[in-house]
C-alpha cells in the first residue's frame, strides 16, 4: 500500500492541491502570502545557510504554523544545551513564518524558512541545501515526498506531540487510516503524548518497525515556562483582571469553542461566573476578521449569558466575561495571567 499511496499522492493529490491553492490564492491573502514567500526560496536559503556555523550539524524542525513553533521551543532549548547544532525552522503557514520570534541568544544559530512545495525536485534541492543531520516534525504536518526522500538518504526523522484523535473522522475511516499508516511508516521515531495514543499508533503501524515512545506534550512545558517567566510589559490592564479567576484558552478552533462556550454560558446563567469571578481569555488559532465575526455571531445567537469584548477594545471594558484576542503573537505572554 505504501507504493500505491506514493503514486496517488504524487500524481493526483499534489497536483490537485497545488492547482486549488493557486486558484484560491486569488481570493485568500494567506495563500497568496505563502506563494509569494516561496518565490525565491532557494536563493534565500542559500544565503541564510552561510550565516550558520558550519562546524555544527543542522537540524530541521518543521512546524505547520505559530502554535507548533511554540511547542518546538522546549526541544530547541534542550538541544541547544549540547552546543552541537544549528536549527533550521521550516513553516508551511505564512502566519508561522511571519510572526514567530527567535529569542536573542539563539539568533545566530537559527534560520527560518518556508517548506517548499512537496514535489520530488523541490524536496531534493531543499535537503541538498540544508544538509540536515535530523528532521523533527511537530505534531501533524507530514509531507510524504519529504519523508520518503529523508528515509532514502538515511536521515533520522522524528514526529513529536503526535496524537491519535479517534473523535475525528480521518482517524476512523479505513482509507484515510491506510494513508496515515503509509506516511507515518517513513518516520524513524513517533513521539506520542500518552499511553493511550501509543496503543493506537502501535495498532495502526502493526507489522512495521517504527519506534513509538511516550514523550508527553511539549505544549504544556512551553506554557509552564511562559508562566514562570515574568514580563515587564503588562498585556492586560491590571484593573481588568483584579480579583478574577482567569481561564486562558489558547489557539482555539471551532470544535473547541463548541465545547467551551456552553460551559461558560451555563456557569454564567447560574450566577456562578460572578461567584467564581471567572473571566475567560480566548485566543483563536487564526484571529482573522472572518473568524472573529463568526465567534461573535455564534455567541450572540446561542449563548445569551456570555458577554464578549475584543482585546483591542479593552479600554472600554465593562465587566465582560469573555475577552477575545484579536491579534497574533501575545498568547505565551497571556498564560502568566491564567489560573486554569
Language model features with spans:
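Structural alpha-helical scaffold elements that stabilize or flank donor/cofactor-binding regions
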Residues: 126-128, 183, 240, 316, ...
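Acidic donor-binding loop of glycosyltransferase active sites
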Residues: 130-134, 318-340
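Short hydrophobic helices that act as membrane-entry/anchoring signals
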Residues: 2-36, 40
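Active-site and donor-binding regions of nucleotide-sugar-utilizing enzymes
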Residues: 25-227, 252-254, 267, 271-272, ...
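Conserved hydrophobic helix-helix packing surfaces used for dimerization/oligomerization
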Residues: 58-59, 135, 247, 280, ...
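Nucleotide-activated donor-binding/catalytic signature segment of Leloir-type glycosyltransferases, i.e.
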Residues: 104-112, 295-327
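Conserved catalytic-core segment of nucleotide-activated headgroup transferases in glycan assembly
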Residues: 68-82, 224-225, 229-313
Amino acid at each position: 500500500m505504501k507504493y500505491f499511496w506514493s503514486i496517488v499522492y504524487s500524481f493526483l493529490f499534489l497536483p490537485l492541491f497545488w492547482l486549488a491553492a493557486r486558484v484560491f490564492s486569488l481570493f485568500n491573502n494567506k495563500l497568496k502570502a505563502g506563494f509569494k514567500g516561496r518565490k525565491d526560496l532557494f536563493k534565500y536559503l542559500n544565503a541564510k545557510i552561510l550565516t550558520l556555523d558550519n562546524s555544527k550539524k543542522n537540524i530541521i524542525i518543521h512546524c505547520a504554523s505559530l502554535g507548533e513553533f511554540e511547542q518546538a521551543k522546549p526541544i530547541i532549548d534542550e538541544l541547544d544545551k549540547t552546543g552541537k547544532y544549528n536549527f533550521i525552522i521550516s513553516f508551511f503557514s505564512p502566519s508561522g513564518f511571519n510572526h514567530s520570534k527567535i529569542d536573542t541568544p539563539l539568533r545566530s544559530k537559527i534560520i527560518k524558512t518556508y517548506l517548499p512545495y512537496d514535489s520530488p525536485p523541490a524536496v531534493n534541492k531543499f535537503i541538498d541545501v540544508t544538509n540536515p543531520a535530523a528532521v523533527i516534525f511537530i505534531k501533524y504536518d507530514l509531507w510524504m515526498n519529504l519523508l520518503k526522500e529523508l528515509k532514502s538518504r538515511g536521515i533520522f526523522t522524528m514526529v513529536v506531540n503526535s496524537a491519535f484523535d479517534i473523535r475525528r473522522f480521518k482517524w476512523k475511516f479505513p482509507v484515510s487510516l491506510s494513508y496515515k499508516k503509509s506516511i507515518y511508516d517513513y518516520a524513524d521515531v513517533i513521539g506520542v503524548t500518552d499511553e493511550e495514543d501509543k496503543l493506537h499508533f502501535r495498532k495502526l503501524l502493526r507489522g512495521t518497525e517504527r519506534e513509538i515512545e511516550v514523550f508527553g506534550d511539549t505544549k504544556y512545558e512551553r506554557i509552564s515556562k511562559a508562566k514562570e517567566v515574568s514580563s515587564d510589559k503588562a498585556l492586560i490592564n491590571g484593573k481588568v483582571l483584579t480579583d478574577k479567576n482567569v481561564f486562558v484558552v489558547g489557539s482555539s478552533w471551532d470544535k473547541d469553542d463548541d465545547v467551551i462556550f456552553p460551559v461558560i454560558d451555563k456557569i454564567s446563567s447560574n450566577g456562578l461566573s460572578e461567584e467564581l469571578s471567572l473571566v475567560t481569555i480566548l485566543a483563536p488559532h487564526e484571529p482573522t476578521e472572518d473568524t472573529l465575526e463568526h465567534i461573535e455571531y455564534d455567541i450572540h445567537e446561542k449563548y445569551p449569558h456570555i458577554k464578549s469584548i475584543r482585546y483591542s477594545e479593552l479600554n472600554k471594558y465593562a465587566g465582560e466575561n469573555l475577552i477575545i484576542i484579536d491579534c497574533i503573537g501575545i498568547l505565551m505572554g497571556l498564560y502568566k495571567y491564567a489560573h486554569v
